Structures are given as C-alpha cells and as structure tokens.
Swiss-Prot record:
Subunit structure: Interacts with RPOT2.
Source species of the chain: Arabidopsis thaliana
Family of the protein in this entry: Belongs to the RING-type zinc finger family. NIP subfamily.
Residues in RING-type zinc fingers: 191-233
Gene Ontology cellular component list: chloroplast thylakoid membrane
Role according to the record: Intrinsic thylakoid membrane protein that fixes RPOT2 on the stromal side of the thylakoid membrane.
Name used for this protein in its record: NEP1-interacting protein 1
Membrane topology per record: Multi-pass membrane protein
GO terms, molecular function: zinc ion binding
Chief subcellular location: plastid
Lumenal, thylakoid side of membrane: 1-44, 100-104
Pfam family, one: zf-RING_2
Gene assigned in the entry: NIP1
Length: 236
C-alpha cells in the first residue's frame, strides 16, 4: 500500500510540463546566446577582412598614383591605404543594411558574393578610391612644409559633417524607368557606392545640385557620416 501511494505521487520528468518548459527555455536561451556570439564573431571577421583587403589594394593603388606624380610613393601608399580601408568598411556596412532589409536573402547573398569578388580583384578600390585619392594626392603636389591642417585634409573623405535623419529623408526619391536608367554613354546607370546597376521599378535617391543617383541604403548610410556626394564631393 505504501509503495502504491509513493508511486502514485511520483512525477517523472516526462510528465511535468513546468520542468519541461523550464528546460526548453534554457535551451532556447543558450541557442540565442550562441547565435549572437557567432554572429558578432562573423561580423568582426568580415569587417577585418574587408578592411585588410581594402588597405592592401588601396596602398597599392595609391603607391602607383604617387609614383606617377610629384607626391611620392610613400605618401600615395599611405593615403590609398586609409582610403581603401574606409571605403571597404562602408561597402561592408551597406551590404549588412541590404541583408537586414526586406529584400530577398538569396539576392542579398549574391550581391555580397559579388562585392567580395570585386573587392579581391581590386575593382572596387581602383574604380572608386583611385579617382578620389588621385585628386587628394595632386592637391598636395609641391607642398613641402605642410601644416597639420593640410595633412588632415588629404585624409578627409568628405567636405562637411554628416546629415541628420530628417535632412536625409527630405532628399528627393525617384523611381527607375526606361527613361532614366541610362547614363550619357548609353550604358545602364549604376549606384557608385555598391557598383550595382539600377533595376526598373527601383526607388533611388537623387542628390540635389549634382543629381547623382544611389540606392537608398547605400547613400543614406553615407550621408549619415558625410554631408557631400560620394562621387563629386559637392556639399549638400
């Protein structure tokens, strides 16, 4: 009888919903923590990878440009390394914004792969950093006794500080159609930040004065840091 009463009062783990729920919550918390840690590590590794590749390619591009001008090999390499690292990190951050947006994850993955391939091949740095850095190097030609302000200006990537969210939202948006998706040479127009062609039906942002067009995530992320056009450097 005593044994029967003991068995009837015994509650195995499988029949205790509260204990099972507690264990499941612990498992979910562990999975969430592990996922967050792995995501942080992966983001840090990718950021370091983009910065490293951008630095190396930027230094190479800057050295070649500096060698062809009076600025010098070392100064050109230094400017190119810094510009390449900054630009590569901004491209990576724009990629993350697109990944977290409502766009197709498969399309974002293809875009990220294309960016990585372009970065490794040097196309991103050569096409976007090269012209801006060449202008910075040439502006310093003949400067022997440069002041601290002059040295700071050569590494500056924008003419003014970033814009607030309200000011960025006021910049006009346009929809890509068959009439505005070609440049002056007849080629498909593209975003100079991510280097991807504009697609019909896409909504892009057209900057005032210069009217250069960019994807919304790309240019918004830029304008929060710089108050100028990333192509022509004209202040907004």
């Amino acid at each position: 009888m005593a044994s029967s009463r003991f068995q009837s009062g015994f509650c195995p783990i499988s029949s205790c919903p509260s204990l099972e729920n507690f264990i499941e919550r612990i498992k979910d918390a562990c999975r969430f923590t592990l996922s967050a840690v792995l995501g942080t590590i992966l983001s840090a590794v990718l950021t370091f990878f983009f910065a490293l590749v951008g630095t190396l390619l930027g230094a190479l591009t800057g050295a070649l440009i500096g060698q062809e001008t009076e600025s010098g090999f070392i100064r050109g390499a230094a400017v190119g390394a810094i510009s390449g690292a900054v630009f590569s990190i901004e491209v990576f951050e724009s990629s993350l914004v697109l990944w977290k947006s409502n766009e197709s994850r498969f399309g974002c993955l293809l875009y990220l792969i294309d960016v990585i391939v372009s970065l490794i091949s040097g196309r991103l740095v050569r096409e976007r950093i090269g012209p801006a850095m060449l202008s910075a190097v040439q502006s310093q030609m003949g400067a022997v006794d440069s002041t601290f302000e002059e040295l700071s200006s050569i590494f500056d990537t924008g003419g003014s500080k970033g814009l607030t969210g309200d000011l960025v939202d006021k910049i006009p948006k346009i929809k890509i159609t068959g009439k505005n998706n070609l440049d002056a040479s007849g080629n498909k127009d593209s975003c100079s930040v991510c280097l991807q062609d504009f697609q019909l039906g896409e909504t892009v942002r057209s900057l005032p004065h210069c009217h250069h067009m960019f994807h919304l995530p790309c240019i918004d992320n830029w304008l929060f840091r710089h108050g100028s056009c990333p192509m022509c450097r004209r202040d907004l």
